């Protein structure tokens, strides 16, 4: 990805399940280094759009590029530049935090896995628990390991799928601090039902309803009160 290129380009992206279009003709460009929050009611297509952009699903139509790579033509190369943090743990519960991270580091071909894993465990504040099985961790601690796992191969774009689900307020604060600490020049894309939190975190906001983009704009161009009303209006639209 050349300097100044957008981190994500979606062009007429569509995903159908039978006769229903979960994502319907979605187009937008997101500058590199941005934090995009995607909002919308249940069934709006938020998670489906995220899955398309992080190569977990194939589009029915249209194209998308992430980190300068066409997802349709070079999906494996794109995955090497993408990280994912989900509300569903992608960790092996009986393995230690260190073992989980080493597994993913080797999977991605990280040059010095042990050093990289040690660095990330220090970043997320879990060096002292590195040898403990993940199943002994709290929900908040598990999410901290998930942050480290998503960053183990130093991705350019990180996707977050409802990352606050099940976290208590203290764990949410720690999660936010860690994300701020690793933002650097990375691009983040988050799906969230928490309007206030998502708006606070983002540089850009995208609202969906019935699979379509209702609004996409930099946060600086949005008034929170008007934006909250727009969100409430989309909730009233329901699903297709």
What does each model-found stretch correspond to?
Residues 39-41:
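The feature captures the beta-strand-to-loop junction immediately N-terminal to the Walker
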Residues 54:
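Helix-to-loop junction immediately C-terminal to a conserved catalytic motif
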Residues 62-70, 78, 215-217:
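Conserved ABC transporter NBD signature motif
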Residues 102, 106-129:
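Conserved ABC ATPase "signature" region
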Residues 158-161:
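Catalytic Walker B motif of ABC-type/P-loop ATPase nucleotide-binding domains
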Residues 198-200:
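A short, surface-exposed alpha-helical micro-motif characterized by mixed small hydrophobic
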């Amino acid at each position: 990805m050349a300097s100044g290129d957008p981190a994500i380009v979606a062009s007429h992206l569509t995903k159908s399940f039978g006769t229903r279009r979960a994502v319907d003709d979605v187009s937008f460009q997101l500058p590199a280094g941005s934090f995009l929050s995607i909002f919308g009611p249940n069934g709006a297509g938020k998670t489906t759009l995220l899955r398309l952009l992080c190569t977990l699903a194939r589009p029915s139509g249209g194209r998308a590029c992430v980190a300068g790579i066409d997802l349709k033509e070079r999906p494996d190369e794109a995955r090497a530049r993408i990280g994912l943090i989900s509300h569903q743990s992608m960790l092996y519960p009986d393995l230690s935090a260190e073992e989980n991270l080493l597994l993913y580091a080797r999977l991605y071909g990280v040059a010095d896995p042990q050093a990289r894993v040690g660095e990330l465990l220090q970043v997320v504040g879990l060096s002292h628990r590195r040898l403990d099985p993940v199943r002994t961790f709290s929900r908040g601690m598990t999410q901290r390991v998930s942050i480290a796992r998503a960053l183990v191969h130093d991705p350019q774009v990180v996707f977050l799928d409802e990352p606050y689900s099940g976290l208590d307020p203290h764990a949410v604060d720690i999660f936010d601090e860690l994300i701020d600490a690793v933002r650097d020049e990375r691009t983040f894309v988050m799906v969230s039902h928490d309007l206030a939190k998502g708006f606070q975190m983002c540089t850009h906001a995208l609202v969906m309803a019935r699979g379509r983009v209702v609004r996409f704009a930099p946060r600086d161009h949005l008034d929170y009160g008007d934006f909250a009303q727009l969100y409430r209006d989309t909730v009233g639209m329901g699903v297709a």
